[in-house]
């Protein structure tokens, strides 16, 4: 894994979970 990919995943996963759980 590249650090950039890990960083992007760390940024996007909370947003995706936020949208799915609708707790934004």
Curated annotation (Swiss-Prot):
Expressed by the skin glands. Keywords: Amphibian defense peptide, Antibiotic, Antimicrobial, Disulfide bond, Secreted. Disulfide bonds join 18-24. GO terms for cellular component: extracellular region. Belongs to the frog skin active peptide (FSAP) family. Brevinin subfamily. Antibacterial activity against Gram-positive bacterium S.aureus and Gram-negative bacterium E.coli. This is Brevinin-1Be.
């Amino acid at each position: 894994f590249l650090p950039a990919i890990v960083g992007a995943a760390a940024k996007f996963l909370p947003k995706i979970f936020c949208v799915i759980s609708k707790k934004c």
